[in-house]
Amino acid sequence: MNKITSEQIKNLFTLPLNELIFKAREIHKKNFEDGDVQLASLISIKTGSCPEDCKYCPQSAHYNVNLKKENLIDVSEVKEAAKLAKKNGANRFCMGAAWKKLRDGKDIDAVIEMIKEVKSLDLEACVTFGSITKDQAERLKDAGLDAYNHNIDTSPDYYKKIITTRTFDERLETIQNARRAGISVCSGGIIGMGESWNDRAEMLRVLANLEPQPESVPINALVPVEGTPLQNQKIVEPEEMIIMIATARIIMPKSRIRLSAGRKYLSNETQMLCLLSGANSIFYGDSLLTTKNNDMQRDKELIKQFKQINKSNSKELINKYLIIFTDKIASTVNY
């Protein structure tokens, strides 16, 4: 496979918005069934006191944030949460722990039991536990784990301004450890942290050139949290999310593109355009680890409406959602 370049990605960024969306839709339709949206539920199994210094994260022990800290929860609590998620329509259950790395001993033993309980409910199991070794990855795979999430967050250059307690290469190493164990990879990033469009292009370039490409790619918009160094960052503009989703779909045609954190700031029209641009997975539930998420009923209505529009395959209907975005991407993208 030919390597994707930052220049190719930046050329996509500067296409007129409607042209970018229709290009992404055509690629999406060749690789996924119409109206296919994966619903993923996310729970925090260990909250706060993380030794990492990620500037966006309220779980870091480095910042004074109003956050209720919790030790590793019981396996039974995870099972009940997974049962509820399935009852509400989720088909993927994700567990996150505020750790720099997964530790051998009681921690890995506990999460292995959690994975087994989730799998017993016929749900996909995904976890994010920080760095993992090759041996740990193999143990998680043996327990039935389907996917490991480890985001690269941003470009290699901008990364140093956001995190100092873990290197970019260490993130790539964990991704490779999961991959070598036969676990599918979930890896994406965050926009709205003060990075440039060049940085966004570089982040997507790194993801697209992983071999193979990640099975899941979460695109997150920063949710500024009081007490973190990024508390005063302005909210990401709606068209920025659409651009990132559509571009990710074009360069990673077979990956699930997940519309992730920050959805609570997006109107139904914006979220609809993200889905029409190739997003085919959302986090479904009241919260994402420590931040609020969309209301579940609102999501049900959104997906119902999306399936109706998608079934019609009408450019006129899709253009209805483009009316509020009359400016071209060139007015948004500043290198």
Where are these regions (language model features)?
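Auxiliary Fe-S-binding modules of radical SAM enzymes
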Residues: 1-34, 208-325
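Short, charged helix-capping/linker segments at alpha-helix termini
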Residues: 322-335
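Hydrophobic faces of well-ordered beta-strands that scaffold small-molecule active sites
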Residues: 37-41, 93, 125-127, 148-150, ...
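Conserved Radical SAM active-site core
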Residues: 61-188, 193-209
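N-terminal pre-triad scaffold of radical SAM enzymes
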Residues: 22-63, 70-94
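Residue-level signature of catalytic and energy-coupling elements of molecular machines
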Residues: 16, 54, 150
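Glycine-rich, proline-tolerant flexible connector loops at the mouths of alpha/beta enzymes
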Residues: 38-44, 64-67, 94-107, 158-159, ...
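Mobile, glycine- and charge-enriched loop segments
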Residues: 35-51, 55-66, 112-119, 123-126, ...
